Amino acid sequence: MTKLPPIEQLLPHDKPMILVDRALDVQQDTIHCQVDIAEHNPFFYSASHTVPAYVGIEFMAQSVAAWSGYHALMKEQAPPIGFLLGSRRYTSECDAFSRGQVLDVYAEKVMEDNGMAVFSARIELQGTVVATCQLNVYVPSKEKLQEMKIRSQQ
């Protein structure tokens, strides 16, 4: 297995909003990341020592972003800015993730066309699937991103 760069190099995010702790494996259409449930997560509730399960959608989305960032780095490009357009059929077998748990997050590209992509994603805890969903994402071209920035300033 190839040693991957730190997650900070794969994501177009800054701390504290980097929620994925590391990428373990990246292939042509797949990624495997891990998330440590701990106090460093901005969604960590200190009273219950948990992170709400709905944050799992963001764990999956950031794993997809890390996949995109890795493939950009392989082309000597910066990790691109992308947008989560939606998630479909998010299901979770729990209400929250507990401190000390290490979540394995897997995502697989189902289709891609003109910057739009669909990924099937899941979260596992000790080999058991605890959450699943489908993510619809968009990575605009540099020109389209610039156009979007100009429009937002008007």
PLM segments and residue spans:
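Beta-strand-rich interaction surfaces with strong enrichment in secreted/lumenal proteins
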Residues: E8, Q34, S92-A96
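Hydrophobic beta-strand-centered segment that forms part of the acyl-chain substrate-binding groove
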Residues: A66-D104
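Catalytic strand-loop segment that frames the active site of acyl-thioester-processing enzymes
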Residues: K15-V51
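A conserved, well-ordered hydrophobic junction motif at loop->secondary-structure transitions
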Residues: D36-A72
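Hydrophobic core residues within well-ordered beta-strands of beta-rich domains
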Residues: M17-L19, L103, A117
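Short Pro/Gly-enriched beta-strand edge/turn motifs at strand-loop
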Residues: M1-I7, Q101-V105
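Residues located in well-ordered beta-strands
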Residues: L19-R22, G86, T91, Y106-E108, ...
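HotDog/MaoC-like acyl-thioester-processing domains
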Residues: A66, S98-Q101, E108-Q154
